[in-house]
Amino acid sequence: MDYRQLHRWDLPPEEAIKVQNELRKKIKLTPYEGEPEYVAGVDLSFPGKEEGLAVIVVLEYPSFKILEVVSERGEITFPYIPGLLAFREGPLFLKAWEKLRTKPDVVVFDGQGLAHPRKLGIASHMGLFIEIPTIGVAKSRLYGTFKMPEDKRCSWSYLYDGEEIIGCVIRTKEGSAPIFVSPGHLMDIESSKRLIKAFTLPGRRIPEPTRLAHIYTQRLKKGLF
């Protein structure tokens, strides 16, 4: 798959923040109408201190049948700095993206979207590069305040930055911690909430696209795939 190269990656942190502040102005939070046919999940892990592994899994929806899996392993040069995850993981994701043959309708990232100090988590940032609707799904809160949803499957609450709604917190599995969902690009809050609920099977905490992508990253790290 093609993508737009919007900036250099070899930037110091202070310049990376300036890039984020400029790119955030280009984000479009628009409703996603209808149902997707193909959904991708993205997961990244770090087998070594300076080595990263990116996996993209494309699924048929609503069967969640796996259609394609691509990966890219390579050197990580950007330091770990909260809020600048895209500069650490983005280059590897894009190299994996280039290998992809099946164009997804929606891409789900293991990370943040709008729920970010500068409103540009990895789902938003990469969404601008690939120009496909994206959603960020995180296992923990990076930014914002919320009221804990009740311990009932599919209960939820909004995530706020002051009075602005920046995402939602969804209890996908009773007895488990909620997940943090926010739109990336070409997606809005209500659509991202609706889709992630639909992508999460009963008894699962994590939606199928990123859950399956994570399984493949673990297999690849162990040399099993």
UniProtKB/Swiss-Prot annotation:
Query: Which reaction is recorded as catalysed by this protein?
Result: Endonucleolytic cleavage at apurinic or apyrimidinic sites to products with a 5'-phosphate
The GO terms this record gives for MF are: deoxyribonuclease V activity; magnesium ion binding; RNA endonuclease activity, producing 5'-phosphomonoesters; single-stranded RNA binding
Q: Provide the E.C. number(s) assigned to this enzyme.
A: 3.1.21.7
Write down the position(s) of the site called Interaction with target DNA: Y80
Cross-referenced Pfam families: Endonuclease_5
Q: Where does the UniProt annotation locate this protein?
A: Cytoplasm
Assign the protein's first listed, main location to one coarse class: cytoplasm
Which GO biological process annotations does it have? DNA repair
- Quote the record's binding site residues for Mg(2+): D43, D110
Swiss-Prot/TrEMBL keywords: Cytoplasm, DNA damage, DNA repair, Endonuclease, Hydrolase, Magnesium, Metal-binding, Nuclease
Gene Ontology CC terms: cytoplasm
Provide the cofactor list for this protein: Mg(2+)
What family is reported?
Belongs to the endonuclease V family.
Any idea what job this protein has? DNA repair enzyme involved in the repair of deaminated bases. Selectively cleaves double-stranded DNA at the second phosphodiester bond 3' to a deoxyinosine leaving behind the intact lesion on the nicked DNA.
UniProt name for this protein: Endonuclease V
Q: What organism, scientifically named, is this protein from?
A: Thermotoga petrophila (strain ATCC BAA-488 / DSM 13995 / JCM 10881 / RKU-1)
